């Protein structure tokens, strides 16, 4: 987030990407098995968007399960750095009841006991909050768990 004291012109100059720039490819985190498709790299923020009832949640839950288990779940393989094992899941649409059901599905996919809280999953249900509060809560969570997610 750019602070109001920062020179915006300098920030703009630094933000421009040129064809002559050279960058190292970030470590690959999420792939689809049996293909060369990379769908996530270390340091990137991902959101799942699409039409209603298009199986977005099903795919995301599969990714979460793969990240927590270190195993392929459905077609997804996720490599999580040992020092950054935390999965932060922010749901803005579903009730706490339905979010709880999603956590149960993740636990079932990874054969994790539902009598224990998985230390590497922080599942946040935000539907009850206004948009500005959701943003603030997500920003706080990102800063609180920085270096672990």
For the regions a language model picked out, list residue spans one by one.
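A generic local structural motif
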Residues: 26-27, 32-36, 74-77, 136-140
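Short charge-dense sequence patches
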Residues: 6-18, 47-56, 86-93, 121-134
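N-terminal pre-Walker A segment at the start of P-loop NTPase domains
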Residues: 2-35
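Short, charged, low-hydrophobicity "junction" segments
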Residues: 32-42, 128
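Conserved inter-motif catalytic segment of the P-loop NTP-binding fold
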Residues: 81-149
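Walker A/P-loop NTP-binding active-site region of P-loop NTPases
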Residues: 38-112
């Amino acid at each position: 987030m750019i602070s109001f004291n920062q020179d915006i012109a300098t920030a703009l100059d630094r933000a421009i990407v040129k064809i002559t720039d050279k960058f190292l490819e970030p470590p690959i985190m999420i792939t689809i098995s049996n293909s060369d498709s990379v769908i996530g790299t270390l340091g990137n923020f991902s959101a799942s968007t699409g039409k209603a009832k298009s199986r977005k949640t099903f795919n995301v839950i599969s990714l979460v399960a793969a990240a927590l288990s270190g195993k392929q779940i459905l077609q997804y393989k996720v490599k999580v750095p040992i020092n950054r094992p935390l999965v932060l899941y922010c749901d803005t649409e579903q009730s706490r009841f339905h979010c709880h059901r999603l956590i149960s599905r993740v636990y079932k996919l990874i054969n994790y006991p539902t009598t224990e809280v998985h230390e590497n999953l922080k599942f946040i249900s935000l539907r009850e909050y206004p948009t500005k509060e959701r943003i603030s809560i997500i920003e706080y969570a990102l800063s609180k768990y920085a270096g672990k997610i």
